[in-house]
Every structure is written in structure tokens, then in C-alpha cells.
Regions:
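A short, well-ordered alpha-helix in the C-terminal region of glycosyltransferases
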Residues: 102, 109, 116-130, 141-142
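Short alpha-helical donor nucleotide-sugar binding micro-motif in glycosyltransferases
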Residues: 38, 45-50, 55
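Conserved acidic donor-binding segment of nucleotide-sugar-dependent glycosyltransferases
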Residues: 79, 93-100, 109-114
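C-terminal alpha-helical cap of glycosyltransferases
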Residues: 133-157
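Aromatic "clamp/platform" in nucleotide-sugar-dependent glycosyltransferases that forms part
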Residues: 58
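Nucleotide-activated donor-binding/catalytic signature segment of Leloir-type glycosyltransferases, i.e.
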Residues: 17-44
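Glycosyltransferase donor-sugar binding loop
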Residues: 5-20
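Short hydrophobic beta-strand element within catalytic cores of glycosyltransferases
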Residues: 66, 71-78
Length: 157
């Protein structure tokens, strides 16, 4: 709808200039807001003010921005084909990175269905608790103990 705003937060790159030019040429400058080099404190505030989170990344080391958004209570639209599906779990919507119409449809789906958006965000929040430091540490400890026990048993044979 015409009251929807898009906030793009990231590094200032040559591509940023292309986005700014496209936005201006399509008379969207009043609804598309580009924020460069946002610090973590400001980023948390942006997440808190958002309705949902779109992450159209083709390549990603792990998908930390998705987890951050989910931890702030946001539902997520992200791309298929990288680690993002593992980072976000089944409650996020995933679209092929070249599917512009699919990305728009997924975003509209979340914007137009507040109950679904909230349910997806809650389920995603439950999913990402597995990545919290204390849970990861406990999982690593369990794996070490299992490995030690396996070694111990194999040495007895």
C-alpha cells in the first residue's frame, strides 16, 4: 500500500547509488529510506520499529541478521540457496533470489496478514533459541561428553 515504507540498512557501496537513483526515478524517495553504516544500537531500534524483515542476500556466512530480526519479534522473508533457511527455520518465508515477484508476494503476505505475521515470528523465535550462547555451549559440551564416552568404550574392547 502507499503507506508502506522500506528501510534499507547496510554499508554504503556503489550499488547504494544505483538504488538511490532508481528510487528517485520512480518517485519513491519519500517511502524508501537508505541508512548507511548503522551501529548496533540504532539497528536494534530499527528492528523494534519494523513490521517485518526482508533479507534478499544471495550469499551469507551464517544469517546473523535474520536471527537478530527474529529475536526482536519480526517475521522474515529471505532467499533460498544459502544458509539462511537453516538460520531462520521453517517459520520464515523463503524465495529464490531472482524471483522479484515472489519476494513482493511474500512481503505482501506478511504485511496483509497480521495474525500470520505474529504466529510466524513467535515460531521463529522458538526456533532460534537453539543459537543462543548457553544452548550452543550445552550442545558442544554434550557432544564432547559423547565423544569421550565413545572413545572410552572403544578402548575397553
Amino acid at each position: 500500500s502507499n503507506d508502506t515504507h522500506l528501510v534499507i540498512a547496510g554499508r554504503n557501496t556503489p550499488y547504494t547509488k544505483e538504488i538511490e537513483a532508481w528510487t528517485k526515478n520512480h518517485n519513491l524517495s519519500d517511502r524508501v529510506h537508505i541508512l548507511n553504516n548503522v551501529n548496533n544500537d540504532d539497528l536494534a531500534g530499527i528492528y523494534q520499529l519494523a513490521t517485518c524483515f526482508v533479507y534478499p542476500s544471495r550469499y551469507e556466512g551464517f544469517g546473523l541478521p535474520i536471527i537478530e530480526a527474529i529475536q526482536c519479534g519480526l517475521s522474515v522473508v529471505a532467499c533460498t540457496g544459502s544458509c539462511l533457511e537453516e538460520a531462520g527455520g521453517d517459520s520464515c518465508l523463503y524465495v529464490h533470489p531472482d524471483d522479484v515477484e515472489g519476494m513482493a508476494a511474500a512481503l505482501k503476505q506478511l504485511l496483509n496478514n497480521p495474525e500470520e505475521r505474529i504466529q510466524r515470528a513467535q515460531k521463529a523465535r522458538e526456533y532460534v533459541t537453539r543459537f543462543e550462547n548457553n544452548n550452543v555451549a550445552a550442545q558442544v559440551q554434550q557432544q564432547y561428553l559423547k565423544t569421550i564416552e565413545t572413545k572410552r568404550l572403544s578402548m575397553k574392547k
